[in-house]
């Protein structure tokens, strides 16, 4: 392993912040004595006060069954520009009052476990609203951080097997904060205050990483703290070559764990091996893997048995948790650094208390209702067997080529009663337009069969790719 130690580096950076009196602290506000007693009780009984269920219930269907007004439906069919303004028009309201809607089965959301409509989670939010309203309005460092937020952080740290966790306003903000804070190490420890090249942080980023990672890395680069190296998507030979040729001591590798537009996994085992060889800091964005992958819902790192090799695990509460917000599971020192230098965390209002309460309930429910994880992977297996398409996750990317083909297929599915979006540039490279299908534990076997039948009428499974051809990768 390389001589450089990230544990020592982050400790030195935190010490510098403390010596300059700019190390920020989180002080949980206790909303009331009753709230404090409830939280202590919840900790004592492991959250046993939360009601859970043994199988799919009728209310689960609200997370996958939706409706759109006829005016919206018509504009959508013809791909007419819309800002949603038609909902305020008299005609649209009249249509709504008459109950004239187009019912659609949702196959494009990220509510993988169907928890957004779970009554236990809804009740947790509702009870918090009734008692506290939205809670104190301010950034977490000022007054927005409560015992609800702290309890949520503790539960997520336990899930991810990390020392601590920092809850952020969104997953996007979490990635931004993490990347900027990592870069700040260079300026904090630079001999002259402005880092020389060999004092900067070298960040190695997968070519298909999420926009929030890309923007965070770009901001850190703009601040003069990092140099960026982009490696070809999941290409460990290319990454190894870049790492071996880089003379900079402080190295970081950042990657999505489960890629949102392709549905493929990062090569976690190979990344772990390279980490042992080069001693880099490994950061993963587990937005689509948290609660979905792993025996306990711990995510992609748990699935591949390499949790100890992940230094920072970024996640979101707006997908499988069915709520809102983001988080960074990490060591206590990294949390101190990020909460002191991560601007998107520092200068954003904390998530409302009802959302923190709901998210904690979601952690409990996801842990206990194991059948939900089993159900979504059963749907993955069924889709694979019925379509013959080689897929490995609940995110199914059916690459059809140009924009016209993708839109035509999406319109056909819309007419057939399915909400499946055509993904186009700039979200994906030109000529790699696709239908992005996502599965949920709230879907049934019959839902999947009906979707496969509709898909078979608008595309040829035998000639449909599930990943981007290498020649379409963004140029380095």
UniProtKB/Swiss-Prot annotation:
Protein name in the entry: 8-amino-7-oxononanoate synthase
Residue positions, PTM N6-(pyridoxal phosphate)lysine: 319
Residues that hold substrate according to the record: 24, 210, 427
Disulfide bonds: none
Keyword terms, alphabetized: Biotin biosynthesis, Cytoplasm, Peroxisome, Pyridoxal phosphate, Transferase
Species name: Arabidopsis thaliana
EC number of this enzyme: 2.3.1.47
Entry GO CC: cytosol; peroxisome
Requisite cofactors: pyridoxal 5'-phosphate
Keyword Transferase set for record: yes
Gene behind this protein: BIOF
InterPro entries: Aminotransferase_I/II_large, AON_synthase_class-II, PyrdxlP-dep_Trfase, PyrdxlP-dep_Trfase_major, PyrdxlP-dep_Trfase_small
Uppermost EC category: transferase
Subcellular location per the Swiss-Prot or TrEMBL entry: Cytoplasm, Cytosol; Peroxisome
The protein's assembly and partners: Monomer.
């Amino acid at each position: 392993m390389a001589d450089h130690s990230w544990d020592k580096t982050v400790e030195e950076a935190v010490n510098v912040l403390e010596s300059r009196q700019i190390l920020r602290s989180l002080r949980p506000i206790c909303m009331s004595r009753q709230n404090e007693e409830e939280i202590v009780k919840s900790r004592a009984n492991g959250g046993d006060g939360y009601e859970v269920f043994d199988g799919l219930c009728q209310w689960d269907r609200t997370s996958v069954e939706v409706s759109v007004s006829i005016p919206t439906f018509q504009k959508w069919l013809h791909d007419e520009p819309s800002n949603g303004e038609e909902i305020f028009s008299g005609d649209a309201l009249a249509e709504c009052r008459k109950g004239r809607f187009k019912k659609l089965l949702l196959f494009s959301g990220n509510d993988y476990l169907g928890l957004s409509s779970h009554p236990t989670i809804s009740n947790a939010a509702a009870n918090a609203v009734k008692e506290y309203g939205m809670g104190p309005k301010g950034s977490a460092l000022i007054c927005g951080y409560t015992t609800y937020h702290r309890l949520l952080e503790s539960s997520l740290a336990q899930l991810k097997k990390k020392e601590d966790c920092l809850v952020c306003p969104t997953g996007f903000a979490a990635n931004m904060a993490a990347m900027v804070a990592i870069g700040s190490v260079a300026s904090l420890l630079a001999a002259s205050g402005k880092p020389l090249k060999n004092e900067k942080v070298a960040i190695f980023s997968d070519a298909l990483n999420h926009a929030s990672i890309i923007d965070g890395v770009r901001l850190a680069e703009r601040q003069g703290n990092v140099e960026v190296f982009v490696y070809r998507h999941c290409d460990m030979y290319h990454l190894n070559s870049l790492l071996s040729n880089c003379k900079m001591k402080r190295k970081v590798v950042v990657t999505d764990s489960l890629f949102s537009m392709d549905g493929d996994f990062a090569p976690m085992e190979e990344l772990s091996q390279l980490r042992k060889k080069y001693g880099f800091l490994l950061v993963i964005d587990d937005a689509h893997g948290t609660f979905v992958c792993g025996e306990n819902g711990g995510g992609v790192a748990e699935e591949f048995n390499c949790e100890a090799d992940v230094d920072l695990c970024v996640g979101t509460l707006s997908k499988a948790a069915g709520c809102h917000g983001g988080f960074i599971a990490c060591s206590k020192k990294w949390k101190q650094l990020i909460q002191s230098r991560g601007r998107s965390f520092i200068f954003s209002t904390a998530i409302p208390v009802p959302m923190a309460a709901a998210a904690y309930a979601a952690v409990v429910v996801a842990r206990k209702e194991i059948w939900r994880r089993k159900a979504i992977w059963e749907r993955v297996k069924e889709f694979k067997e019925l379509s013959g398409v080689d897929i490995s996750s609940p995110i199914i990317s059916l690459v059809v080529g140009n924009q016209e083909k993708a839109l035509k297929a999406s319109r056909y599915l819309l007419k057939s009663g399915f909400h499946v979006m055509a993904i186009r540039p700039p979200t994906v490279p030109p000529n790699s337009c696709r239908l992005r299908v996502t599965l949920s534990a709230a879907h049934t076997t019959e839902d999947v069969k009906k979707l496969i039948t509709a898909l078979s009428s608008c595309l040829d499974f035998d000639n449909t790719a599930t990943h981007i051809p290498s020649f379409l990768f963004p140029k380095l």
